[in-house]
């Protein structure tokens, strides 16, 4: 029996424990069942889930539960992305160990990561996440690192991996190179500096504009637009850089924007991506003025050792003293920052470094073509990937100057030759392991280990191969081969908008290059979570809400409904009032089933399910099956928000407020046949509503199932039952019309009772309904209206009622007449009382009435009085309500 009170903190942990103990979600390879493999996102092991995780992973869980109910064999593992700078920083801070002790440092990284995994797994379980935890994977596992290294060896064989010096995105704060996908432009306030550069021949100056005067020591050219009349005569000349007394050429290039600043810019190696393009296009020298730590180097001359920001300020001051800085304009401009890690956000420098690359730029057309074969939800998210692919300036930098990461499976010699690891030795760590050979097989030189580690996206970009056991299948493992063939390409990749250009892009590329196939059939994209104030959640805004703040108060199911209301591809604000509403909805659901339990728990539905039902039963079941059809179609499109709103509205209003209220008189009445039909409809309705809700709110539906249905059905979980079957024969448009009519009429009668302070079950002695077009339909539901509203005498007539409106009282507006007539007011009141009808008529006709009291003229307008009217039918006073063509008379 369902307890009186809905308490999610009581029921939710109980069922989470039950699901784990009974292995309800255990995946077993079954080649006779259709496969549905989900390439779940492995969150970085920060130690705690945020609401973004809750949103994305609840979506995934809804899909998994739905697909199981549709008969699919759902492969639903969950992994954790372990490597990365935040863990290294945490270990340095927590344990006081530096990277100079690599083995001890790595040991502590692994130790801390395991603690984070344990905490996050508990949080996943607490939101009702139905992964098969026996398939959990971690990117720091040896077998996982071996698979990543195997994929790199395959790329090396294909000629896709190389090492060279190239300008890379460099984070001075993190002291490592970054991929383009890890950086982004942030709009900020800054200054545009206008500087006069002297011409080398002494004939004058050329004015340039720059946001970075500190890069002057790295200037290698000045550029103008070839059609700019202001500077055409200067092309080919040289300028002499102030402070450094070095000459650089003035060149013309169409990439210059003549409308920016002065229309002339200097080319420094390297201020931005455009500087790289010009340096390569014109084979200009490379001068580096910035160190890895973000300080100026010896090429900066008198500014060496200063931080970039300090050097910018000092060189601007010196140029101003020299009379060469003639304007400093405050502007908003875009600054390149380390955006992937909100804990960093440092400005990025472009520094030439010896780095490892995967060739990807040559394959962007191929990647876009493969991506187009995937079904994108929403469709326009494909364009984000396409735009990203087409904007790439150089290949994927995969090396990171860190410690905790998957090692490269390579050694190098001093002549630059690459020595790959033997496959049978994987995983290897060149920092600690012996190389496969003593000398370089190409030139005989000494061999050195590659001490860099891999970009974490190299790890996570093979997740669809990891979960389908590609790494075992290619070794000849027969079971793994079957597993891979049955599950790859995977059915679904769920992920956020923020990692389309990283996880989605790199996974499509890497998987296709390794298998010749797309990684998934569908990809569904969720937006980001905003704070209650609509802004991005941030500690600096003070608008961060943690899942652990929400669940103890409202439970996981109420929070899950909040996630389900998020539109695909759009940002979704967290609103406390939404979760509160969801909780009240679940209380309503609880009360519906508590009411129904006594009527249908022991009812033999199978015996009576084909009985001819009454109009309102047919109405609610017709509406139910329309909802089933809609929910099924929209779940296939991953539009949870549309289903959730429709389902909540249907349950709260049509089921709880209307049908159940209109069926109570039958369930408690003496008409056994009518009671039987009501039970058939109520059972079919609530059994299927439970199934429709199950993927969204798994805990409350499991509680309901065990309390009301399990004894008859036998299956050990609601989540092992079949999805509701849409029945075309249940669609009844005539019954739906009758149901809507009953709702409207009953609603008006409820309003009448409320306005008179009557309980909803209070008796109405006499009600008459008049209608024209609706007359025949009203006669069909006459019994339901009378029974629902407890009407002693209900009459339904065809036609319009004969009504008489009478003036029964005219009252004065004391605030208006008091100041005007003072002592006469009591006499005026008496006059109004005795002549109410004639006074009201005259005011209606003339807008005013005039009369005398004790010889003094009194004039009243419609604003001075309140006219009370009453309606009579056949001499008896009535109150009326009108809905459509229907007039309701309350006697």
From Swiss-Prot:
Motif stretch ('KMSKS' region): 536-540
**Keyword Coiled coil in annotation:** no
Chain ranges for the short sequence motif 'HIGH' region as given in the UniProt record: 43-53
List the Gene Ontology MF annotations in alphabetical order.
aminoacyl-tRNA deacylase activity; ATP binding; valine-tRNA ligase activity
Q: Does the keyword Cell membrane apply?
A: no
Sorted keywords for this record are:
Aminoacyl-tRNA synthetase, ATP-binding, Cytoplasm, Ligase, Nucleotide-binding, Protein biosynthesis
Which cell locations does it reside in? Cytoplasm
CDD domains recorded for this chain?
Answer: Anticodon_Ia_Val, ValRS_core
An example of a Pfam family matching this protein is Anticodon_1
Q: Which InterPro entries has this protein been placed in?
A: aa-tRNA-synth_I_CS, aa-tRNA-synth_Ia, Anticodon_Ia_Val, M/V/L/I-tRNA-synth_anticd-bd, Rossmann-like_a/b/a_fold, tRNAsynth_Ia_anticodon-bd, Val/Leu/Ile-tRNA-synth_edit, Valine-tRNA_ligase_type_2
- PROSITE patterns in UniProt: AA_TRNA_LIGASE_I
Under which EC number(s) is this enzyme classified?
A: 6.1.1.9
Q: Report the top EC class in one word.
A: ligase
- Tell me what reaction this enzyme catalyses: tRNA(Val) + L-valine + ATP = L-valyl-tRNA(Val) + AMP + diphosphate
What this protein is reported to do is described as: Catalyzes the attachment of valine to tRNA(Val). As ValRS can inadvertently accommodate and process structurally similar amino acids such as threonine, to avoid such errors, it has a 'posttransfer' editing activity that hydrolyzes mischarged Thr-tRNA(Val) in a tRNA-dependent manner.
Q: Which family does it belong to?
A: Belongs to the class-I aminoacyl-tRNA synthetase family. ValS type 2 subfamily.
The protein in question is named Valine--tRNA ligase
User: What organism is this sequence from?
Assistant: Pyrococcus abyssi (strain GE5 / Orsay)
Q: What is the lineage of its organism?
A: Archaea, Methanobacteriati, Methanobacteriota, Thermococci, Thermococcales
Q: Source gene?
A: valS
